[in-house]
Amino acid sequence: MKFVAFRGPLILILFGHVCAAALWCSDVSRKPRVRAITAFVSIDRATYGKQIQDTLAMLRKAKSAFEKGGYEVQTIRITTQPFPQYTRGITKAEALEFFKGLDALSKKEEFLANVGPAMLNDQDDSAVDLLADILVSTDINTSLVIAADDGIHWNAIRAAAKTIKYVEDHSANGVRNFDFAAAAFVPPYTPFYPGSNHNGRGHQFSVGLEGGSFVADVFTESHGDPRIARELLSHKLAEHARSLEAIALQVEKDSGWSYMGLDATPAPGPDSSIGAAIQQFTGTRFGSSGTLTAAAIITDAVRSIPVKRVGYSGLMLPPLEDSVLAQGWSEGAYRIDALLAYSAVCGTGLDAIPLPGDVSQQQLERIIGDVASLAFKWHKPLTARLIPAPGKKAGERTDFDFGITGFPNVILQPLP
């Protein structure tokens, strides 16, 4: 879609010290996309094939409904209850055969699959080896829980670091770490992967957005004024949120599936950079002063929408999914510590972070531990999705291929 920059005037009304946009002008901002319609199911190994087909029938009707409403839909997804619950009593080999079958079905029917987290209990690591083998044997998403209301899960942190190194060594160029997250406080019914999870009866769905270009267009209209930026973004995001919720509630009525809510986190995409949006606001490169303010404005706007919300409801900053963020990473404009600082006001933690292949398990434990500590301190959803590049050192360029056209590679930076 061709981008026509807004050039018209804004009429402002002053209320004391607050300047709010009273005339929203002609709306030239590009629509957010629907990144994911995610269904949550409680599967039975014996009947899962029929369960998946019934779920796909709902998802495809939902996709059609959103498209008729004017929203592009990128993916449909299915998240199961935590996989250790339905692999008890069978051998590891039998479990892997089951997951390979689920993976083959997902490819045939064109949906993304997530089998939920392991180690809900920090003392139970019995499913960790199976989790690692699921990752290297299939294209299924999964996660480990590293912090929750009961505290920081230090055993799970060690298990996550061990898993990342195993997957680095046992999958093609380590790319399967892309579909694994060490997750803290990620709430149920989150539509985004890999942290998506639920532990209930199923028969529910939620919706997640992509919106880098949408945010960039709104920030163009704000001319760098933080008050106007927040008001404009809140107003325009709320308009779309109401429209999306109306469609979702009609799907709920027609299908009998329960709608759990919208995660309006404006995820980036190959042609929809959230890094570019933030630079549009600050007038300088990502990582400079003002970046934290932009992150806070976006998060405040996302959390202000007057609809049912789920998930992170914040901001994603994945260097390996966003060309502008990738360029800044390659230039050393920001590092892991900066992303953790931004996570204090937004989310979603350390997402799609490229690391040198010689990063040690102990270094990974410390990084994941920082994410868990921050999440526990503020009781907020954060994840660590860390992707070491096998055989690559700081200063060298990655050559990842995640199977998604437009995802960038970067120059690796030394660890802090």
Residue positions per predicted region:
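Bacterial N-terminal signal peptides
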Residues: P9-A20
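Anaerobic metallocofactor- and corrinoid-dependent redox/one-carbon enzyme cores
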Residues: W24-P416
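Bacterial N-terminal signal peptides that target proteins for export
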Residues: M1-I11
